[in-house]
Amino acid sequence: MPDTLKVADVTFGGNHPVALIAGPCVMENEAHTLAIARQLLEVKNELGVGVVFKASFDKANRTSVSAYRGPGLESGLRILDKVRQQTGLPIVSDIHDVSQVEAAAEVLDILQIPAFLCRQTDLLLAAGRSGKVVNIKKGQFLAPWDMANAVAKVASTGNDRILLTERGTSFGYNNLVVDMRSLAVMRELGCPVVFDATHAVQLPGGAGTSSGGQRQFVAALSRAAVAVGVDGLFWEVHPDPDRALCDGANSLPLDQVKKTLKEMMAIDAIVKGNTES
């Protein structure tokens, strides 16, 4: 299993600088999605950091049946293709069903397996057979060493281009906690590891018909993960989180991304010995 993974011009793993996966939880509309992507491109160019754009075309696991889910597969992939054409950023989005894999693989650089679905064998095998990079999010119900089974399922297809993402562990009701040892444990599985700091501060179902969150802790948990030596950070971002159609309570305000990322890059450089003497 390669400990370094290159996705377009973004490198995860080895002793490379921490990369960023960022974007809105869900595509609200085309203009909104493109505007966020352009701002993230500016951050990439100004800081010289690797950036992958993320956005969901369908949030199939929303708390409430009436919650906004997104534009759907066809329209969503069209928007994401436009993002790539206009910004050059590599793209990741989550897939929820085997039937989505073929179409998604035509547009996406990374196929993401949602945490709730990380044990779904058919989905993991289909994603692996696509030949695309597969980002498996660790289920909130799994120990980090149990991710070896998910890795083995994808690798059995001959595809060893795998990322693993930590996003917190269930802690009682409506809460998550992050065990930073998980990052080191999963790294031993031979795959680059990403830390999803925004979902880690989510309060699942904590608002009754939606999830709550504590976005004020995103930077603190990101600092801890970078200090451990994580290969990538995953942030859901939004220009106005309080008005976001999904996961606003745990999204990082878009205007804070550059400042917060600069701080993470400084810590990362020290941890990985990449500072200039």
UniProtKB/Swiss-Prot annotation:
Q: Name one GO biological process term.
A: keto-3-deoxy-D-manno-octulosonic acid biosynthetic process
An MF annotation (GO) of this entry: 3-deoxy-8-phosphooctulonate synthase activity
Q: Which UniProt keywords apply?
A: Cytoplasm, Lipopolysaccharide biosynthesis, Transferase
* Top-level division of the source organism's lineage: Bacteria
- Which InterPro entries does this UniProt record tie to the protein? Aldolase_TIM, DAHP1/KDSA, KDO8P_synthase
| One Pfam family of this chain | DAHP_synth_1
Q: Write out the pathway annotation from the protein's UniProt entry.
A: Carbohydrate biosynthesis; 3-deoxy-D-manno-octulosonate biosynthesis; 3-deoxy-D-manno-octulosonate from D-ribulose 5-phosphate: step 2/3; Bacterial outer membrane biogenesis; lipopolysaccharide biosynthesis
Provide the Gene Ontology terms for cellular component: cytoplasm
Q: What is its main location?
A: cytoplasm
Q: Which reaction does it catalyse?
A: D-arabinose 5-phosphate + phosphoenolpyruvate + H2O = 3-deoxy-alpha-D-manno-2-octulosonate-8-phosphate + phosphate
Compartments where found = Cytoplasm
As for family, the record states: Belongs to the KdsA family.
Q: What is this protein called?
A: 2-dehydro-3-deoxyphosphooctonate aldolase
Tell me the organism: Syntrophotalea carbinolica (strain DSM 2380 / NBRC 103641 / GraBd1)
Gene that specifies this protein:
kdsA
